[in-house]
Every structure is written in C-alpha cells, then in structure tokens.
C-alpha cells in the first residue's frame, strides 16, 4: 500500500477508532470473537483525522460524476468528499421509506452516471454490496468502492470480485499492525495472534479465555 495507508492507520490508532486486544478478545453480536475492534464513527469527532481521511478519499474519486454511500456509515464521508470534489451526492437507505415517495436512494439521480461508492468500514461487504445493487438497479455505473478500512478476509475479496466491483481500502490490518508495533503497543506474539484471526476468524480464539 502507498505511504498514505500507514498515515491513515496511525490516525485511526491515535483517534481511538481501532483497539487491539488479542489477549482479551472482543465478542461481536454474532458471537464471533475478535482481537481487533474498529469503530470509525469515532473519527467524526476528530477534526485532524477526518480531514486526513477525507483527503485520502478524494484521491480515489477520479472518474466519478456522483459520490454515494450506504446509510449511515458512509453518509458523512460522502458529504465531505463530495464538497471537496465539487460533486453531487446520494445515499442508499437500509430500506425504502414506508411513506411519501418510498425512496430507497436519496439525493441526486444516479441514472446513467458514473458513481464512486464510499464506506467507512467493510467487513463482509454485505451492506455496501446491497447498496451497490440498489444503485445499479437505478441505472448507475459503479466505478469502484472505497472504504477507510477492511479486515482483509478472502471471503470479502471474493464477494466484491463476484459483484464486479473493485474495492479500494485507504488502510488495512497490516498497516494498523505496523503502526501499533512501532508505537510499542503490540508485541510480536500478539501480532501473530491477530494475523491468525485474519486467516480463520470463525475458528480463532477457542483456547483464549
């Protein structure tokens, strides 16, 4: 990844958006145990970090006529990047409105327009790929999806490949691990635990209390 990926990773750690706890794993609502927790909503309150992320997003908006994102995580980034680039924006609801015009996509019309999709975090990709399908159903031509962070799971890469949607991540787990190691907050043994989780997230952590 380019040098900016390491800068973004360091920004996420400084802002407290990412927590590494391989010896005391987090448990997600799904029951999945994880040595890493990422909440990029924290960045909304960190002016320096959000400016850095917005600038990084705009570098990947070439070729776009519209910027769009899924509700709710993508909305602020789409708004800031669209303002910076001087582009119109849209966002995709989780479900169509149950009243009024019953719209699923809000904002500018995407029909016949080249759209870059922005998201904060991509895990399995399920929600952002649903948004992509909705945009395509409205006639959008999707250029790429850009996210702040992704875990690097092979299943996610496969899902985006199957959807014929290029995925670009501003930073990823290796860069975060490099930043944490450089800061002295992650040992070599702890890093190995995190890397093992990436390879097998479902089976990881059975022997950790």
What are these model-predicted stretches?
Residues 1-63:
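Active-site-facing substrate-recognition patch
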Residues 59, 79, 83, 133, ...:
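Short, well-ordered alpha-helices that flank and scaffold nucleotide-derived cofactor binding pockets
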Residues 61, 107-111, 159-160:
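Solvent-exposed alpha-helices and their adjacent loops that cap or buttress functional pockets
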Residues 64-71, 146:
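Short glycine-rich phosphate-binding loop at a beta-alpha junction
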